[in-house]
Regions:
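Transmembrane-helix motifs of polytopic, lipid-linked glycan transferases
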Residues: 19-42, 116
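Hydrophobic, aromatic-rich transmembrane alpha-helices
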Residues: 116-127, 180-187, 243-264, 307-310
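Membrane-interface helix-loop-helix junctions at transmembrane boundaries of multi-pass membrane enzymes
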Residues: 127-155, 189-197, 252-271, 314-323
Length: 329
């Protein structure tokens, strides 16, 4: 609709289409950088997060490289290759590549709205994680105290609920992914009723739009374990996760022990869309769940940006500094 208006006002259709897409993606990356800087106070951590957004971790290329080095036709194969590299189910469709944002231009705009909500609700996370208690006592107080539930800013919650609810018109996966991240943040936040108000309004407006614009059922949720993993055992699913993302997700779970309380709370929220993709199917085609993995991937880059920045600057003497830089590279 917006692109159509731009064309009506005299802008070429392709320019209008690309302009909206570029501004949406640029806006999302700006908010992603803002989330990184807010947590880690480092320009380089935020810059690295943006780089990792475009250049993902994975094992497919290394598998491809080794396979064709052994065959002795690597250079010729790279020159003639016209398809996405992939060894897992439907990976050659480009499920895990940046083209996801090119094929679904509305996804970046939806993620921009979700990222704004995440950035705003980080105030609630900081309030919940700033208490002096530790361990079980702190966890208990996040559920069984007045501060844990009483509203902190109802107006902001209503506004964000409206924004997220209207986002469903552009991309339902971005809305669901955003609400999943907020659910993870809410666990460790004060003012949980604000989250309830925001989520309730978002779901309400999403349902209203579905009734107006769509005939029949929009979703048919069901439990579906394992996503696209061929081996549905726990070890098989973990190995599939390693195949599609390298050490990106599995390594982040290990690295979480070195994060501060508030940072771990945000990380938990960012990982929930990925977990959702491996547990729930909302449509008959499970392939569409790849968007939830991509949403988690986009937000978790913030933490890898910080880790790589720390490794790069590690070491007090010359050889340790260069060792840290080599490890970061």
């Amino acid at each position: 609709f917006l692109v159509g208006n731009l064309e009506y006002l005299g802008l070429r259709l392709d320019l209008g289409y690309n302009l909206v897409s570029i501004l949406s993606l640029a806006g999302f990356l700006m908010v992603l950088y803002g989330i990184s800087y807010r947590m880690f106070k480092s320009f380089w951590a935020g810059a690295a997060a943006i780089v990792f957004f475009f250049f993902r971790s994975g094992t497919a290329f290394w598998h491809y490289l080794w396979e064709h080095l052994q065959a002795g036709d690597l250079v010729r194969t790279l020159e003639e290759n016209t398809a996405f590299i992939g060894y897992t189910t439907n990976e050659n469709w480009g499920l895990w590549n940046f083209n996801v944002y090119l094929n679904q231009r509305h996804l970046a705009f939806g993620l921009l709205m979700a990222a704004v909500a995440v950035w705003t609700f980080m105030d609630w996370v900081e309030a919940g994680c700033s208490h002096k208690e530790h361990g079980f006592l702190w966890v208990r107080n996040r559920f069984f105290t007045k501060k844990a539930w009483i509203c902190r800013n109802v107006d902001t919650a209503i506004l964000l609920g409206l924004f997220l609810g209207l986002t469903a018109f552009w991309n339902g996966a971005a809305l669901i992914g955003g609400l999943l991240i907020l659910a993870g943040l809410a666990v460790f936040s004060d003012g949980k009723l604000d989250y309830v108000i925001c989520a309730g309004l978002a779901v309400l407006f999403s349902e209203l739009q579905s009734k107006i614009f769509v005939s029949g059922s929009v979703m048919s949720p069901s439990f579906y374990w394992g996503f696209l993993a061929d081996n549905k055992s726990i070890s098989g699913v973990l190995w599939y996760l390693v195949e599609i993302s390298g050490f990106f997700f599995v390594g982040m779970i290990v690295a979480a022990v070195f994060l501060k309380r508030g940072q771990r709370a945000v990380l938990m929220g960012c990982l929930l869309p990925m977990a959702f993709a491996f547990l729930v199917s909302l449509t008959p085609d499970i392939n569409v769940n790849h968007k939830y993995v991509m949403i988690s991937y986009a937000f978790v880059t913030v933490f890898w940006g910080w880790i790589v920045r720390c490794v790069f600057l590690a070491g007090k003497n010359s050889w340790k500094k260069w060792a840290g830089r080599a490890a970061a590279a």
